[in-house]
Structure formats: C-alpha cells, structure tokens
C-alpha cells in the first residue's frame, strides 16, 4: 500500500524511528540492521515500508533495503510468526545468515532471536525452504553505494554527510554516484 517513506528523522527510539513527512510524524518500527544504517536526527532517510493492519490500529514497519522488506513479508506468511517476531529475527540474524540457515536447516541460528523457539524456527525453515534463494547475492546497487560511501569518506566527508548525499542516488557506477553526491553536498 505504501511502498516507501522518505522524510526527516525527528526521533530515534529503541525499536522505531519517527519520520517527519511534510509536518506529519510517522512512527515506523525498524529492525536493528536498519537502525544502525540510519543517519543522525535531522537528516533525510528513505525506508521501504510494510503497513500492518490490526483490529485496534495500524503499524508501519520500515527497512533500509528492499531485500529486508521482502524477507519480512515472507516471514509473515509463516503461521505463528507475526510482525514483532519477524522484526526480532531481522534484528538479530543478518539476511545472508538467515538464507544460509533456511537452506541448511540450521534452526539454532533463528532461535537467537527473542521470542523464536525451536518449533517456530523449524516451521520457518520448513515453510520458507522453497521461497528463499539458494545462495546469497549482494545487490549491485548496495555494493556500488558502499564503494561510493567509502570514496566520500576518503574525501573528508563525515559518514552522516555521505549517507545523506547518497540517500536518493540512482547509480550505474561508483563514479556516477560520487558525482551526484558531490553535487548534492555542494548545494
């Protein structure tokens, strides 16, 4: 329903972030993996979102990478796994480790997440074995952006400045990403 939200970070809580979107503060629950990639308060960020509707209200869950959102949605398809359980897994288990665990049947990795016991972990593996890729592929865009981030850091920009400058860059090459980011930083 809502593909993504781009706005200014107003506040960061232990499991959520408040994004100011044209004067409206939106509370978005995020996994730890997304939390550690967020720029500081006052900077712009973009999160891919999932709107969860319950009888007593709405909750929005956000992810820095689209692959995390897709995995979150797959976890919700498993009986007995709700949004908080799926978020717990994504907070503790990196995507690459999750995919390896599902493909190898290693439920112990999944039980590291709070609220996920042996039976739930085994059910996740059983139900998602045919739904996750056989091997982990780092998205090209992420690796390009990481290289561009390193280049901006080498040029003397702070990590928060570099992340902000690269937040909405669509790139085909590292050079192109750095050029677009430098233009944004020059404004």
UniProtKB/Swiss-Prot annotation:
SUPFAM superfamilies: DNA helicase RuvA subunit, C-terminal domain, Nucleic acid-binding proteins, RuvA domain 2-like. GO terms for cellular component: cytoplasm; Holliday junction helicase complex; Holliday junction resolvase complex. GO terms for biological process: DNA recombination; DNA repair. It is found in: Cytoplasm. Transmembrane segments: none annotated. One of its GO terms (molecular function) is four-way junction DNA binding. Residues 140-187 are annotated as: Domain III. The RuvA-RuvB-RuvC complex processes Holliday junction (HJ) DNA during genetic recombination and DNA repair, while the RuvA-RuvB complex plays an important role in the rescue of blocked DNA replication forks via replication fork reversal (RFR). RuvA specifically binds to HJ cruciform DNA, conferring on it an open structure. The RuvB hexamer acts as an ATP-dependent pump, pulling dsDNA into and through the RuvAB complex. HJ branch migration allows RuvC to scan DNA until it finds its consensus sequence, where it cleaves and resolves the cruciform DNA. This is Holliday junction branch migration complex subunit RuvA. It comes from Caldanaerobacter subterraneus subsp. tengcongensis (strain DSM 15242 / JCM 11007 / NBRC 100824 / MB4). The gene is ruvA.
């Amino acid at each position: 329903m809502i593909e993504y939200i781009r706005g200014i970070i107003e506040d960061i809580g232990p499991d959520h972030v408040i994004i100011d979107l044209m004067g409206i503060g939106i509370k978005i629950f995020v996994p730890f993996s997304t939390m550690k990639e967020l720029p500081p308060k006052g900077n712009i960020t973009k999160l891919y979102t999932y709107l969860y509707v319950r009888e007593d209200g709405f909750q929005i869950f956000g992810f820095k990478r689209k692959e995390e959102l897709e995995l979150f949605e797959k976890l919700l398809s498993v009986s007995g796994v709700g949004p908080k359980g799926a978020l717990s897994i994504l907070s503790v288990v990196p995507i690459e480790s999750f995919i390896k665990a599902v493909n190898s049947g290693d439920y112990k990795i999944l039980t590291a997440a709070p609220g996920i016991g042996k039976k739930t972990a085994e059910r996740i593996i059983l139900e998602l074995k045919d739904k996750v890729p056989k091997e982990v592929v780092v998205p090209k865009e992420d690796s390009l952006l990481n290289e561009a981030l390193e280049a901006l850091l080498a040029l003397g920009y702070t990590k928060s400045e570099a992340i902000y400058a690269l937040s909405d860059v669509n790139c085909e090459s590292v050079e192109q990403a750095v050029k677009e980011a430098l233009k944004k930083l020059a404004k």
